[in-house]
Amino acid sequence: GSPLRSPRDGIGVKHAILSKHERNRFSMKELKGACIIGQSGGPTSVINASAYGAIKTALENECITNVYGACNGIKGVLDDHLIDMGKEDPDELAYMKYTPSSALGSCRYKLKDPDVDDTDYKRILEIFKKYDVRYFFYNGGNDSMDTCNKISKFMLKNGYECRVMGIPKTIDNDLAGTDHCPGYASAAKYIATSVMEIYHDARVYDTGMITVIEIMGRNAGWLTASAALASVKGCGPDLIYLPEVPFDMNSFMEKVQKIYDTNGEVIEVLTGPSVIDELNKRALAYKETQNGYEPLPNEAEGEAIADYSGNPDDYAN
């Protein structure tokens, strides 16, 4: 049998060795009340599947009296714009499992520090009391988890018992405490497919080509790293640069030149504002000609880079 299971009754060993007092200490008392579920941040292919799981389970839980969906995330709570999910057709709700985007609507609204301005928090508490909300689920990424943290602390400070839970969702895959977030896998698949398509597009020309693919991800390189999946089909990038690794322009240029001299083309994938900024500056040092790009004279190159503001429009033309 598994070393994590008791051969006698299947109870996990960790659970079995806890005393009755310890088990009671970790268990929560029964709490009855309504539940609000909301979504925020960028939608993904699977965020609705997570929301559906929470909605369905809440509707079946005897401790939860009503289940409400917040329209457009926390703004729906602030505006008292809630949907009674118990009145929805269960068969229609089940379609959420396979429906992309955010079924309840989303927002990019960030709550302020309650020590600076607690207006929103007082309004949230007012709505919670109005509907006797004792459970709040928020489905999103880092900002959504920050919202959960702030609301939970405010409710605790004001003596209102409410269990606040974050449901992870981010294609960046950068939420602490998660191995892989819902949304990352589908985004990784999309990136790998896109890199394979770019690989084939870049090979059709009779002149050499250097292709730079910029991928989002804030300061996390999970999405960028997923481009390596294209290598399984022999269409992967030549170079991958992650924001977690310091970027050296000279080393980068040497590697690009070496691969270009060998293969006649280069595909590189990267992310991170510092990397992109360096490449944008370098791009200004060239002018477009009939046969491609040629370096500017040293004096003109210096002026172009000095005038660079960090705006992509500076070099787009």
Task: Give short role names for the model-derived ranges.
Residues 30-38, 96-110, 169-179, 206-209:
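Gly-rich Lys/Arg/Thr-decorated short loops/hinges at beta-loop-alpha junctions or inter-strand turns
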Residues 34-42, 134-143:
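A short, small-residue-rich loop immediately preceding and capping a beta-strand
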